[in-house]
């Protein structure tokens, strides 16, 4: 805002204060009054009649007397924030026929009588958060026929009367989080057919009765996180046809019935983070085709069934981090074509199948950090065209020939990929080196002795046409690299890594049976293939045999 406009606005506020009466200890702005004077001993009796909103902040009076606001019939909003109010007399808010929003937050109110709210028939929102309420009368809300939002978070409620919410048929939001509830009475929510959000987070619930949520057919968001739930009834959610978001994290759930989520066709968000799950039943998410976000992190999963996510074709985010997963089936992510974020960090993965991510063409963020990976198979990222964030840190990477695909891929997309900093764990001479900075010639694999065939034609222009059969120490491969010189007279086929370690032993030349023959020759070739350039030098010395 420009300085001139700001000064103009402040001037108007000051002018408004000067031209209208305002209670002592309060500030008035148009139709709003803010009272924050610690010396204020009671509700001001001289609140202007045109005021619609009044807010008390950190005031010291402890009692709201009967019909304390009766001189202000136009009030629609009354708020007490962090005040010392601890007692509300019967009909404390009587005489407020237009009151729609009442809030008492952070006050030491510990109990309420049944008649405190008896005349608030226009109330739409009631907030009693972070007070000291230990119990509620069963008929406390019986006259609030049009109440839409009820906030009871952060109190000390241990139980709920069975008929407490019976008259709240228009209720849309109910917040009971951060209390001490250990159980829910049967039918407690039976009349709340229009409820859209229910928060039961951070209580002490160990189980939920079979029909506890049975009538909530309009419910869209359900918070059950931060409790002590160990098991869930197979039909607990069977009537929640409208449910879109479900929070079950921070519990102690060790088993999920296969039919648990089968009625939740509109579910888009599911968090099972921080439970005690060891397995996922096959078909658990078979009926949740609309799911977009799924978190299974901080459990004890050791593997994932191949068909676990088969029907989740719209899934955007999947979190499997902080488990004990050692192995992932080749096709476990096969149908996740819309997946953007995949977290596999902090598991025990030692190897990944080359085709594991092949259908994830929209994948942008992949976290593989803090596993036991020593290498990655060739081609594993070839279809991940949108990948820009790849976390690899905390793996024991062996920087030898088997890591050549990863280093080449990182160099190729160096300007597009972030978060790739990770270090070699071996071999010893590369330990601590940054993997993305390695050169191809540094990635060497030792070769175990074996047999490899090598065929050279026309070693020297002066030699007659013919061939030499050479025995080469190195393992004979079903070759991926076929090297040749430009003339095609020298052919060498071997694995890329093993062509670096050749020890050649010559057998007798075909047709040569002269023991007295002396032969000296040396030849160098530059051989090329799709694997790169290989330089080969062969020196042959055949001294005459003794008599």
UniProtKB/Swiss-Prot annotation:
Residues 1-21 form the signal peptide. LRR repeats lie at residues 98-119, 122-143, 146-167, 170-191, 194-215, 218-239, 242-263, 266-287, 290-311, 314-335, 338-359, 362-383. Pfam families: LRR_1, LRR_8. Residues 395-447 form the LRRCT domain. It is found in: Secreted. InterPro entries: Cys-rich_flank_reg_C, Leu-rich_rpt, Leu-rich_rpt_typical-subtyp, LRR_dom_sf, LRR_TM_domain-containing, LRRNT. Glycans are attached at residues 74, 111, 119, 266, 311, 348, 359, 367, 520. GO terms for cellular component: collagen-containing extracellular matrix; extracellular region. Residues 22-49 form the LRRNT domain. Gene3D superfamilies: Ribonuclease Inhibitor. Disulfide bonds: none annotated. Transmembrane segments: none annotated. Keywords: Glycoprotein, Leucine-rich repeat, Repeat, Secreted, Signal. PANTHER family: ANTIGEN BSP, PUTATIVE-RELATED, LRRCT DOMAIN-CONTAINING PROTEIN. Tetramer of two catalytic chains and two glycosylated inactive chains. The 83 kDa subunit binds and stabilizes the catalytic subunit at 37 degrees Celsius and keeps it in circulation. Under some circumstances it may be an allosteric modifier of the catalytic subunit. This is Carboxypeptidase N subunit 2. It comes from Mus musculus (Mouse).
């Amino acid at each position: 805002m420009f300085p001139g406009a700001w000064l103009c606005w402040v001037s108007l506020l000051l002018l408004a204060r000067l031209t209208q009466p305002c209670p002592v200890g309060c500030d008035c702005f148009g139709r709003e009054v803010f009272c924050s004077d610690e010396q204020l001993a009671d509700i001001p009796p001289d609140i202007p009649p045109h005021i619609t909103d009044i807010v008390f902040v950190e005031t010291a009076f402890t009692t709201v007397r009967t019909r304390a606001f009766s001189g202000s019939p136009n009030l629609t909003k009354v708020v007490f924030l962090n005040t010392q109010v601890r007692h509300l007399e019967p009909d404390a808010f009587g005489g407020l026929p237009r009151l729609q929003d009442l809030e008492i937050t952070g006050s030491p109110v510990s109990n309420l009588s049944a008649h405190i709210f008896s005349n608030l028939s226009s109330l739409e929102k009631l907030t009693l958060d972070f007070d000291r309420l230990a119990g509620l009368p069963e008929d406390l809300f019986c006259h609030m026929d049009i109440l839409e939002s009820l906030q009871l978070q952060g109190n000390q409620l241990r139980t709920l009367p069975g008929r407490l919410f019976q008259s709240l048929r228009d209720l849309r939001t109910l917040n009971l989080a951060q209390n001490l509830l250990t159980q829910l009475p049967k039918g407690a929510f039976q009349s709340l057919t229009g409820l859209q959000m229910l928060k039961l987070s951070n209580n002490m619930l160990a189980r939920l009765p079979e029909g506890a949520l049975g009538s909530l057919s309009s419910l869209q968001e359900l918070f059950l996180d931060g409790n002590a739930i160990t098991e869930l009834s197979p039909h607990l959610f069977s009537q929640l046809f409208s449910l879109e978001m479900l929070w079950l994290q921070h519990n102690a759930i060790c088993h999920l019935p296969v039919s648990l989520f089968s009625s939740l066709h509109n579910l888009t968000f599911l968090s099972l983070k921080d439970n005690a799950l060891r397995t996922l039943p096959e078909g658990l998410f078979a009926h949740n085709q609309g799911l977009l976000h799924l978190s299974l992190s901080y459990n004890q999963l050791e593997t994932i069934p191949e068909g676990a996510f088969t029907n989740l074709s719209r899934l955007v985010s999947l979190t499997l981090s902080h488990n004990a997963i050692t192995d992932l089936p080749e096709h476990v992510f096969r149908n996740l074509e819309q997946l953007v974020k995949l977290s596999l960090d902090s598991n025990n993965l030692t190897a990944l199948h080359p085709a594991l991510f092949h259908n994830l063409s929209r994948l942008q963020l992949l976290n593989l950090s803090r596993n036991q990976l020593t290498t990655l198979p060739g081609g594993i990222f070839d279809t991940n065209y949108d990948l820009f964030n790849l976390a690899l840190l905390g793996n024991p990477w062996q920087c030898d020939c088997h890591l050549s695909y990863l280093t080449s891929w990182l160099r190729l997309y160096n300007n597009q990929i972030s978060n790739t900093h990770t270090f070699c764990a071996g071999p010893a001479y590369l330990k601590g080196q940054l993997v993305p900075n390695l050169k191809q010639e540094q990635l060497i694999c030792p070769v175990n002795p074996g047999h490899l065939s090598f065929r050279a034609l026309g070693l020297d222009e002066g030699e007659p046409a013919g061939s030499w059969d050479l025995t080469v120490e190195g393992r004979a491969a079903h070759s991926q690299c076929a090297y040749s010189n430009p003339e095609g007279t020298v052919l060498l086929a071997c694995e890329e890594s093993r062509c670096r370690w050749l020890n050649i032993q010559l057998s007798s030349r075909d047709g040569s049976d002269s023991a007295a023959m002396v032969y000296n020759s040396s030849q160098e070739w530059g051989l090329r293939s799709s694997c790169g350039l290989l330089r080969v030098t062969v020196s042959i010395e055949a001294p005459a045999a003794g008599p």
